[in-house]
Amino acid sequence: ALEYGYETPESFTKAFTRFHGTTPIEVRRDRSKMQLFLPLHVSIKIQGGSKINYTVEKTEAFTVIGFERLFSFETSYKEIPDFWTEMYKIHAPNILAGKGPKTEVEHAIMENYIGEFGVCIEDAPAPGKFRYMIAGPYQGGKVPQGMKLYTVPANMWAKFACVGALPNAMQSVNTKVWSEWLPGNKEYDLAGKYNIEWYSADGDPDSTDYESAIWIPVIPKK
C-alpha cells in the first residue's frame, strides 16, 4: 500500500471499505490526467440556515477503471454497499494482509487507486437500471479481466464538499443538493446522465473531519 501512495495499510483499508450506498433513487447524481479551469468557490445559505459549499470547475475528459455492476434504482441503496463488500473480500485480502499485490487485479487496484470514486452512469438499456462503478483514475496499461474502463466526457462540474462521518455527512449534503440546490439554482442546469462520489484515501470515514464530495455535471442556464 505504501508503494502506491497510501500512507499506511490502514488508510488503504478505509479507502476500499468505506460506505458507498448513497446513490439517490430517481436522481442523477480524478485527479490524474485532469486539467482544471476557472474554479469558482461558492457558499450559499439554504433552508434552515445551513450552508452548502461547492466549487464549479471544468475538466477535460478523463478515464476511470474499476469494477462495474448493473443496479436497480429501487434496491441500489442496499445492493451497492454489498457490492463494495463483495469486491473487498474477493480482491483485497492479500493487500490488506500486508503481502502486497500478487495478481493483475491486485496490481490494478493499487496502481489506479480503486476506491477513490463511486461512479453512477445512467445509460443502461433496461428501464429503472443504471451502471455503478467502484473506480479510480486510470493510469494506463492492461485492463485485467473483470475490470472495465469508462471515459467521463469533458464537463463543467459542481463539486459539493462533504465533511464529516460517513454515511451521514454525504447523505445530508446529497439531500440538500438534489432537493434544494438544483431545483432552486438560477445559474446551472443538470447536464449528463452520470455523477461521481469522491472519497479521500486519508483519514477515518467515521471521523467528524473526514472529507468526501459529490460531483454533478452542470451547464449554465441559457
Annotate the PLM regions:
Residues A1-P9, T13:
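DNA-binding recognition helix and immediately preceding turn/loop
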Residues E10-K222:
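A solvent-exposed interaction/effector surface
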